[in-house]
């Protein structure tokens, strides 16, 4: 077998075929070849990649350069494979699976629908890092291959050649293991983006990959015996019914990418009388006995495929790569199709597809993989859920951070708040029994640990809006005090100045407080109500943390509960 990973945005089927045709005479059949891309956005485009992106926008000279570069890339890939064949040595293969955390789900949702690119804290991810290594007779690592599910776009699109974080990962791995050749492929990360951007961050991301590889290879790995058993097939992925000619003729009157797509669709209608409603899709599998199944999927595959395959197969023996052997475009899941947006809809234009996929596409891909890997790799009885499909909670780091802050030298005011919190914690009870009807809004935002969670809030600029809740049944202490604890935040600092907020207890105004990102304390004029805020997560604009509300001689209702509300005072 042979695997080639190219620093490029994507390798279309035509390029894979041209390379495969050259290698047949050297004993490598097309089925035994995998050609993958790192998906860096900083590489020259290949002929056949995302045809609509450059259609009508290239000069004859640029077309010539693209063709020349494509041939150059194929020449270099062929040369690399032939050198590897010539220099074959007996090696011991081993593999391990680690975890790296810089990939975040980029699909921001609003009421369950795609709202743009960003960071969705609760979205699925794949933080697994499978690693394959080859050691020589002396135990020295001579080859490395790592795989991570994340867009290779930390640097972003720049008009200069660069490998982005995958390139830095390769460089770092080869530094850590002198004399080794490394490969970095990409998993099902079509809707996963790197958290953080810029050249230095890309280097940091690459270093994170290499550090985990180094750690894994210093621990117990699983040896692999013999060459892999190779299998593969082409399946047809269903699209929704293509639009009729009249639709494309109307689109032709426009401009831009939709105009170019219409030209391509009308050309197909003129040539064959129809537009295909299926996409030809290759799936390949390498199996090392019962120890490891390596799955290779074409295109930009969303993370749900990894989540599902790791649930329905034995994830402890599974490796899933995407961007392999062809680039038909994004491969969305049922979830992504239901949410809509870029990966489900507009991206299809770039790849010269007539429309979105039918939701049956997910079952088609998953069933093909399960057929090829076979029953040996089915989910085990009582199998635990793969641990790398959700972002780790920030709670542990939060309390470590608070401990460090408490031990540091802080302002006198902050130290007073800290001392007050220490006094209140032993007797504090939960503040929220049930939420009451109000005009508060719902959103997903960062909580006290920096985790993205469902929250209700009122806007500091929306005068009169009120957030209401009722406490659980309460018991006063011997001094007639009740201390309630809840989590939340206080406003957005760069917003125009407002009057702040009013805290209401039992319908009556108790005290006023204002936007802050620092530890703070507010006391009512009659000293019967005290509100203390301890931020445990902060950004440049807002914060999240713990509130402690102390009430003196307050009268609960007939059920032993207290009605509490916060009202926005709006602009001054």
Task: Locate each region found by the language model.
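Non-catalytic substrate/cofactor recognition surfaces at enzyme active-site rims
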Residues: 1-549, 553-560, 567-571
């Amino acid at each position: 077998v042979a695997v080639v990973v190219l620093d490029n945005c994507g390798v279309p089927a035509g390029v894979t075929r041209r390379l495969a045709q050259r290698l047949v005479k050297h004993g490598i059949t097309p089925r035994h070849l995998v050609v993958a891309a790192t998906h860096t956005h900083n590489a020259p485009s290949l002929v056949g990649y995302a045809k609509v992106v450059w259609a009508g926008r290239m000069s004859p000279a640029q077309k010539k350069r693209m063709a020349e570069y494509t041939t150059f890339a194929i020449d270099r890939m062929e040369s690399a494979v032939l050198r590897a064949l010539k220099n074959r040595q007996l090696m011991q293969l081993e593999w391990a699976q680690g975890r790296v955390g810089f990939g975040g789900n980029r699909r921001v949702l609003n009421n369950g629908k795609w709202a743009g690119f960003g960071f969705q804290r609760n979205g699925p991810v794949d933080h697994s890092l499978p690693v394959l290594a080859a050691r020589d007779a002396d135990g020295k690592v001579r080859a490395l291959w790592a795989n991570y599910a994340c867009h290779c776009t930390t640097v972003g699109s720049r008009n200069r050649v660069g490998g982005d974080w995958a390139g830095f990962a390769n460089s770092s791995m080869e530094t850590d293991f002198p004399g080794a050749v490394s490969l970095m492929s990409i998993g099902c990360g079509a809707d996963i983006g790197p958290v953080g951007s810029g050249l230095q961050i890309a280097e940091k991301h690459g270093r994170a990959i290499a550090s985990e590889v180094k750690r894994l290879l210093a621990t117990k790995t699983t040896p692999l015996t013999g060459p892999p058993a190779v299998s593969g097939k082409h399946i047809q992925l269903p699209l929704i019914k293509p639009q009729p000619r009249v639709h494309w003729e109307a689109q032709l009157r426009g401009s831009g990418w939709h105009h170019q797509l219409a030209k391509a669709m009308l050309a197909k209608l003129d040539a064959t009388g129809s537009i295909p409603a299926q996409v030809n899709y290759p799936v390949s599998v390498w199996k090392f006995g019962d120890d490891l199944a390596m799955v290779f999927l074409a295109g930009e595959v969303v993370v749900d495929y990894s989540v599902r395959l790791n649930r329905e197969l034995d994830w402890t023996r599974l490796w899933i790569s995407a961007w392999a052997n062809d680039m038909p475009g994004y491969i969305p899941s049922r979830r992504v199709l239901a949410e809509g947006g870029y990966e489900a809809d507009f991206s299809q234009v770039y790849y010269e597809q007539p429309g979105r996929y039918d939701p049956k596409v997910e079952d088609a891909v998953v069933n093909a993989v399960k057929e090829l890997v076979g029953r040996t790799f089915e989910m085990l009885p009582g199998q635990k859920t793969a641990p790398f499909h959700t972002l780790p909670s920030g709670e542990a780091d939060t309390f470590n951070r608070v401990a460090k802050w408490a031990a540091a030298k802080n302002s006198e005011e902050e130290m007073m708040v800290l001392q007050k919190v220490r006094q209140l914690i032993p007797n504090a009870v939960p503040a929220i029994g049930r939420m009451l009807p109000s005009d508060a809004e719902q959103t997903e935002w960062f909580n006290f640990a920096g985790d993205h969670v469902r929250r209700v809030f009122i806007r500091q600029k929306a005068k009169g809006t009120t957030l209401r809740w009722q406490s659980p049944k309460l018991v006063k202490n011997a001094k007639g005090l009740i201390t309630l604890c809840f989590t939340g935040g206080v406003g957005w600092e760069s917003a125009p100045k407002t009057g702040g907020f009013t805290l209401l207890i039992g319908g009556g105004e108790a005290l006023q407080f204002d936007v802050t990102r620092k530890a703070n304390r507010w006391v009512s004029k009659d000293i019967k109500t005290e509100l203390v805020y301890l931020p445990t997560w902060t950004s440049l604009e807002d914060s999240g943390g713990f509130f402690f509300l102390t009430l003196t001689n307050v009268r609960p209702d007939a059920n032993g509960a207290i009605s509490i509300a916060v009202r926005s005072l709006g602009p001054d």
